[in-house]
């Protein structure tokens, strides 16, 4: 059951994601889960699903209040709140590298060849090392992971290999890793604010940009770009997390219930992601954009040295091994 309740002083709607199904069971605990996405985002819907499942599994004893749109605080503030015991849960990703350097592995360009490869890493030995470091150094416990849509390059001409970039002016985020990788690939990367991208494409200041399909769609880049080149250069994931201090208050049975509800939320979010990717592609194609397959191996090989030069010494051997897989 999802309830939407206006909370005074908050900028957005608070979703109460769980209620006791019977008056015979008294609510014992309410977990506050804040995140940055809006109510339509798959992460938010998965967070609500988590609350519903946890309520069912605990006979209504544990409720989850979901606060979207940064209404409980910005991402770093939420992590700090979890460490202080004022926030119970959030959805977060590579921001955790401020405490746990291995969290940078959540979004390394060309480290993951496919969604399946990323899943293997996130749920395997490397993923376990990342989670343990986050628990130890950030006092935040990852309990599920949500995949993000891969980033793709848009342009006014088809790009199938690094050679096709040939100095193409393209917008990138103001992140040294992105600038260096696209320079190594042969483009001319130009950091700029996202709010300036559409007009810059329209006026020819830049020739391309890179983002996930959902953002390409919502920003109406189909009006100023003709091609989506499926570079999929960044595959990444993000964690549903619970504060260690909150986790420690739970009985073993309730901890098991939390993990079971988190697994359900993870599966639910994956279904939403795949639906969204297919829907966004169909929409962009209907608006005239052409999807182009690229030589992924050639892009990865050209980007490797720049990626390795930009990651920390602690994770460099792992990144090198991922490139070799």
Swiss-Prot record:
The lineage of its organism: Bacteria, Pseudomonadati, Pseudomonadota, Alphaproteobacteria, Rhodobacterales. Keywords: Periplasm, Signal, Sugar transport, Transport. L-galactonate binds at residues 75, 93-95, 148-151, 171, 211. GO terms for biological process: transmembrane transport. Residues 1-26 form the signal peptide. Belongs to the bacterial solute-binding protein 7 family. Its main location: periplasm. GO terms for cellular component: outer membrane-bounded periplasmic space. It comes from Roseobacter denitrificans (strain ATCC 33942 / OCh 114) (Erythrobacter sp. (strain OCh 114)). This is Solute-binding protein RD1_1052. The keyword Secreted does not apply. It holds the Pfam family DctP. Solute-binding protein that binds L-galactonate and D-mannonate (in vitro). Probably part of a tripartite ATP-independent periplasmic (TRAP) transport system that mediates solute transport into the cytoplasm. The complex is comprised of an extracytoplasmic solute-binding protein and a heteromeric permease formed by two transmembrane proteins. It is found in: Periplasm. InterPro entries: DctP_fam, TRAP_DctP, TRAP_DctP_sf.
């Amino acid at each position: 059951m999802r309830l939407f309740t206006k909370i005074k002083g908050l900028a957005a709607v608070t979703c109460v994601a769980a209620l006791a199904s019977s008056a015979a069971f008294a609510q014992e605990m309410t977990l506050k889960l804040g995140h940055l996405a809006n109510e339509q985002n798959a992460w938010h819907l998965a967070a609500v699903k988590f609350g519903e499942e946890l309520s069912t599994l605990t006979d209504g004893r544990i409720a989850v209040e979901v606060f979207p749109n940064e209404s409980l605080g910005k991402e770093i503030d939420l992590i700090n709140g979890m460490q202080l015991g004022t926030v119970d849960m959030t959805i977060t990703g590579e921001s955790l590298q401020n405490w746990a350097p291995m969290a940078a592995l959540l979004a390394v360009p060309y480290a993951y060849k496919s969604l399946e490869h990323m899943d293997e890493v996130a749920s395997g030995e490397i993923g376990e090392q990342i989670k343990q470091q986050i628990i130890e150094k950030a006092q935040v416990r990852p309990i599920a992971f949500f995949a993000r849509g891969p980033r793709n390059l848009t342009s006014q001409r088809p790009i199938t290999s690094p050679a096709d970039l040939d100095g193409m002016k393209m917008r990138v985020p103001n992140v040294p890793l992105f600038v260096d990788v696209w320079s190594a690939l042969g483009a001319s990367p130009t950091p700029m604010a996202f709010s300036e991208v559409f007009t810059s494409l329209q006026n020819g200041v830049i020739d391309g940009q890179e983002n996930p399909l959902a953002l390409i769609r919502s920003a109406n880049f189909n009006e100023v770009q003709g091609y989506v080149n499926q570079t999929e250069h960044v595959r990444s994931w993000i964690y549903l997390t619970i504060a260690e201090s909150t986790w420690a208050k739970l009985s073993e049975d309730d901890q098991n219930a939390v993990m079971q509800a988190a697994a359900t939320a993870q599966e639910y979010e994956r279904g939403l992601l795949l639906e969204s990717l297919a829907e966004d592609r169909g929409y962009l194609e209907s608006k005239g954009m052409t999807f182009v397959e690229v030589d992924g191996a050639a892009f990865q090989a050209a980007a490797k040295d720049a990626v390795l030069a930009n990651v920390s010494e602690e994770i460099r051997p792992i990144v090198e091994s991922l490139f070799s897989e």
